[in-house]
Design a protein with these regions (language model features):
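Positively charged n-region of N-terminal signal peptides that target proteins for export
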Residues: 2, 23-28
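Cysteine-centered motifs
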Residues: 11-12
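Sec-dependent N-terminal signal peptides
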Residues: 28-37
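A short beta-strand-turn-helix
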Residues: 43-65
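Short pre-active-site segment immediately N-terminal to redox-active cysteine/selenocysteine motifs
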Residues: 63-65, 69-73, 104, 145
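Conserved redox-active cysteine motifs that mediate thiol-disulfide chemistry
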Residues: 69-86
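Structural microenvironment flanking redox-active thiols in thiol-disulfide oxidoreductases
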Residues: 81-118, 131-136
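Thiol/disulfide oxidoreductase modules built on the thioredoxin-like
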Residues: 120, 127-175
Length: 182
């Protein structure tokens, strides 16, 4: 009988162990374990403006994309969060939703706890860059106010809408449908 650990040991024989990559490898092992044991948990990656742009570039041909920049201490962010999660489920075939937390890195556990409470089981990000550098790198018209939402068109891959501040469901829905059809 082949066990998980024997499979893991076999796979590791082909991987050169790198102590600098240990935190990332540990995250992958946790993710694999959660998948194997059917425990869906949010995955939180550290991100810079550049890495987020690369993620968008790699995904833009498949679906419309919604980026939501938020923080656990931001009341309007927390208020609109469940609505965005519901819309992510509703439009899952046509819309990729990425939450990017701008909380401090030492608040990572708090961010993960909030994501879990909200039922987020997909890849999310936490800002790992100085505030102004991050803000300027994301969008030239973003003042830094939260929440901040950007939508990229499904076909065009270009920014089709963006806004600062909490918005009603009607505004989100109209913008999402426009992004899916753009």
């Amino acid at each position: 009988m082949v066990t998980f650990f024997s499979k893991f040991k076999y796979c590791c024989e082909f991987i050169r162990f790198d102590f600098q990559a240990f935190p990332q490898m540990f995250r992958y092992l946790i993710t694999i374990s959660l998948i194997l044991f059917s425990c869906e948990q949010p995955i939180l990656y550290h991100a810079t403006a550049e890495s987020i742009k690369k993620k968008i570039e790699s995904e833009k041909d498949n679906q419309a994309i919604l980026l939501n920049f938020w923080a656990t201490w931001c009341e309007p962010c927390v208020a609109e969060f469940p609505m965005i999660v519901d819309m992510a489920d509703e439009y899952e075939n046509d819309l990729a939703v990425y939450f990017i937390s701008v909380d401090w890195l030492d608040e990572e556990d708090k961010v993960l706890s909030f994501l879990k409470d909200q039922g987020v089981t997909w890849t999310t990000f936490i800002k790992d860059e100085k505030d102004q550098e991050f803000i300027n790198g994301i969008h030239r018209e973003w003042s830094g106010a939260l929440p901040f939402t950007i939508l990229y068109g499904k076909t065009s891959g270009e920014v089709v809408d963006f806004w600062e501040g909490e918005q009603p469901e009607k505004r989100f829905r109209k913008a999402i449908i426009n992004a899916i059809n753009s």
